[in-house]
Amino acid sequence: MPITLTTGEQLQIRQAAERLQRQFSGTLNTETIERFINDSLDTLVGRATTSTWIPLLAERFARDRLRALVRLESDPTTLNPSILFLCVHNAGRSQMAAGWAKRLGGDRVDVFSGGSEPADQVNQAAVTAMAEVGVNISGEIPQPWADEIVRAADVIVTMGCGDACPVYPGKRYIDWELDDPSGKTVEEVRPIRDELERRVQGLLAELLPEPTVT
């Protein structure tokens, strides 16, 4: 049965559109921003079983897509390197990797993540394991990837979903074979967390001219 947004949720969507218009003012026009948030909303409603997180997720998904669109329309020589981390559910490995990339790369790298079959929430064992090392991913929500985001990324890291990812010429694709944290305890997730840190550090060392934060 199709999801129907409440009056309050529809108001939240309008407020989200206003925030995005302020954020991208002077860069993207109002029509483009409204088209992207409406398209993002339609995509998410088509997948959802509940409307609870739809307004927040639609805003975040649209923001990432608009960030990607700005990259695609900009001079490549003026841009930071960008990485897209993909796994099946965008609930464990890709969220942890994105968390590490943001922590270690700071504002010198643009980070995106997504999943081929997004879960309802981020894996709690992954959240706890990352919090132990000072990386907060508790506020993240799994989301799908979009064509603009894939095209805007310089490096696309897949973890268990490579066959589902569209291939574009000129992109660098890397497949990381790592255990899926799903169903694992915090103790079992820690080695995955630490291996992701090592791999993200190595990737950032290739992409960034200065040493990464440790």
Give names to the regions the model predicted:
Residues P2-D39:
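A short N-terminal interaction module
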Residues P2-L5, C165-T214:
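Phosphate-binding/catalytic loops
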Residues V45-E73, L79:
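Short, charged early-sequence alpha-helical segments and their helix-coil boundaries
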Residues A68-A146:
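Conserved active-site segments centered on acidic
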Residues A91, C161-A164:
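Short glycine-rich anion-binding loops that position phosphate/pyrophosphate groups of nucleotides
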Residues D154:
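Conserved acidic residues
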